[in-house]
Design a protein with these regions (language model features):
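FMN-binding flavodoxin-like domain, especially the glycine-rich phosphate-binding loop
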Residues: 1-112
Length: 112
């Protein structure tokens, strides 16, 4: 399961290629917010990914707000990862992301 946000399409392309390569479902964060969908269940062996552009050296507000409302039911060994696209420097985007994820009991084990 990959949650993504993209304004220009760059991150959408990256997230789509990763989803195809690893066989994961791709979910667009703005659509989920419009639908009021925040509860998800990870299947056994399913990974959880987040893809987003870096805005001002951090994840976009829409991503942070979505994570605060997110409710994930998962296996104890569920693997979480995150990828950010950026022009030159991701700043503290992943540190901020992991602080948000910690509020719902998750941590991105690998970040790109």
């Amino acid at each position: 399961m990959i949650f993504y946000f993209s304004r220009t399409g760059n991150t959408r392309w990256v997230a789509s290629e990763i989803a195809k390569a690893i066989g994961e479902e791709l979910l667009y964060i703005p659509d989920l917010i419009r639908q009021g969908q925040y509860a998800f269940t990870l299947k056994e062996g399913e990974r959880l990914g987040f893809c987003f552009p870096t805005h001002g050296w951090q994840p976009p507000r829409i991503v942070r707000d979505f994570i605060r409302r997110l409710c994930i039911t998962k296996a104890d060994d569920a693997y979480c990862w995150a990828l950010t696209t950026c022009g030159d420097n991701m700043g503290v985007a992943m540190t901020i992301l992991n602080k948000e994820l910690a509020t719902i009991g998750l941590k991105a084990e690998t970040t790109f």
